[in-house]
A protein has these predicted regions:
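SAM-dependent nucleic-acid methyltransferase catalytic core
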Residues: 1-32, 162-163
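Class I S-adenosyl-L-methionine
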Residues: 24-33, 37, 41-61, 67, ...
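Surface-exposed ligand/attachment interfaces on beta-rich extracellular proteins
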Residues: 70
Length: 170
């Protein structure tokens, strides 16, 4: 697929494979993203299954494939700072400032109670508490099967107040 650029106000939205799009962009101040964790791989291999599989959808194997190392190399080379949700699933250097989202939910059979973000920042680990409906976005339009709450993303942006350009390659 050929990369396509769409301008929305003073923002650019690129539609295409991040391996093709990132080299076209100037370096950015922050990559804030929630890369695919490989849930699709788990479903294909008979992972969680059950209600979780129905919730995520049968086609997760098509869109939720763990990114290759070259994608992370592109991101590191194209950005000053990074925040990767699900960073504990990827082969990247250890973080010196992990972030945690406590979903404020009782134990769920097949969903995590919290999620970790890998960051390029240094300092103490920090936690954000936001109630989610069964681990998913509460009281917000759920436009994506693994959507993060807007307040969580706003909190993430607070760690890079000087960032003028933010990229989400996924």
């Amino acid at each position: 697929m050929m990369a396509e650029k769409v301008t929305i106000g003073n923002c650019e939205l690129w539609h295409g494979d991040c391996r093709e799009v990132l080299p076209l962009l100037p370096p950015c101040d922050l990559v804030l993203t929630d890369p695919p964790y490989g849930i699709g791989d788990a479903l294909v291999k008979g992972g969680r299954g059950g209600s979780f599989e129905r919730l995520i959808s049968a086609n997760a194997a098509e869109w939720d494939v763990t990114p290759e190392k070259e994608v992370f190399d592109l991101i590191f080379g194209h950005s000053k700072n990074q925040i990767f949700w699900g960073g504990n699933y990827f082969e990247i250097p250890p973080t010196k400032k992990p972030l945690c989202w406590d979903k404020v939910r009782p134990n769920q059979k097949n969903l995590s109670e919290w999620e970790m973000a890998w960051t390029s920042f240094t300092g103490r680990a920090q936690m954000f508490k936001h109630c989610a409906n069964g681990g998913f976005v509460a009281a917000e339009a759920n436009e994506h099967p693994t959507q993060k709450p807007v307040p969580l993303m706003e909190w993430c942006l607070s760690f890079a107040p000087e960032a003028r350009t933010v990229c989400d390659p996924f």
